Amino acid sequence: MTSQRTRERLIQRLYEEGVSNASVLEVIRRTPRHLFVDEALAHRAYEDTALPIGNNQTISQPYMVARMSELLLEAGPLDKVLEIGTGSGYQTAVLSQLVERVFSVERIKVLQDRAKERLIELNLRNVVFRWGDGWEGWPALAPYNGIIVTAVATDVPQALLDQLAPGGRMVIPVGSGEVQQLMLIVREENGFSRHVLGAVRFVPLLNGPLA
C-alpha cells in the first residue's frame, strides 16, 4: 500500500522511536519511498524495514534514514553534504530536501543510473553524482560540512576525515559482520570527536567502481 494513511503510520512510528526533527519527518512523509524499490516490493515500501534493491544492496530502513539525517542537521543547516553510497537514491532524495547541495558517490553504475532517473522524476535538481570508490570520497570538491556514509566501513576512511570541514559532522557505521556501531564524528579545532550511538546493520563499504 502506498496510501497517505500508510505514510502517516510510518511517520508516527518514527516519532515514537525518537526521531523529533520536524523537517526530517515532513520530508520522509512526502518522499515516495515506493518509487525507490522494486515494483514487486512496493506494497512494503512504508514498512520500517530495509528492502533489497538488487546487486546485493538494500534500501535503508526509514528509521535509519531519518536518524542519520537528523544527526547531520543537529548543529544547524548544512549547505554541502557528501553522501557515500547512493544506492537506491532514497537517502539522497531525503537529504536533497534538507540541505543546499548533495554530492553523492556510488560504485555500482546501474544503481546510480536508476537513482538519477528517480531524482529527475521528483524534480530534485541539487544533487551531483559521481561513479567511483566511496573510500576515496570526492576530494576535488572538498571540504564538506556534512558527510553521510550508507554502508559499513571496517574503519573510518582517512580520506573522508580529510574532506570534512572544520565544525563538520560525519555519520558513519563502523565495524564488520554482526558487530557494527553508528558513529558521529565532528571535526573540532584540535582533531576529531567520536560518539558511538548504538548497534546497526549495514551492507559493507567496498572498494572500487563496478559497471
From Swiss-Prot:
Localization per record: Cytoplasm
Active site: 60
Superkingdom of origin: Bacteria
SUPFAM superfamilies per the UniProt record, alphabetical: S-adenosyl-L-methionine-dependent methyltransferases (SSF53335)
Swiss-Prot/TrEMBL GO biological process terms: methylation; protein modification process; protein repair
Keyword Transferase: yes
GO molecular function per UniProt: protein-L-isoaspartate (D-aspartate) O-methyltransferase activity
Main location (coarse class): cytoplasm
Documented EC number(s): 2.1.1.77
Any one GO cellular component localisation term in the record: cytoplasm
Record keywords: Cytoplasm, Methyltransferase, S-adenosyl-L-methionine, Transferase
Substrates-to-products reaction catalysed: [protein]-L-isoaspartate + S-adenosyl-L-methionine = [protein]-L-isoaspartate alpha-methyl ester + S-adenosyl-L-homocysteine
InterPro entries on file: PCMT, SAM-dependent_MTases_sf
Family: Belongs to the methyltransferase superfamily. L-isoaspartyl/D-aspartyl protein methyltransferase family.
Entry function: Catalyzes the methyl esterification of L-isoaspartyl residues in peptides and proteins that result from spontaneous decomposition of normal L-aspartyl and L-asparaginyl residues. It plays a role in the repair and/or degradation of damaged proteins.
Protein name per UniProt: Protein-L-isoaspartate O-methyltransferase
Origin organism lineage: Bacteria, Pseudomonadati, Pseudomonadota, Gammaproteobacteria, Pseudomonadales
Gene: pcm
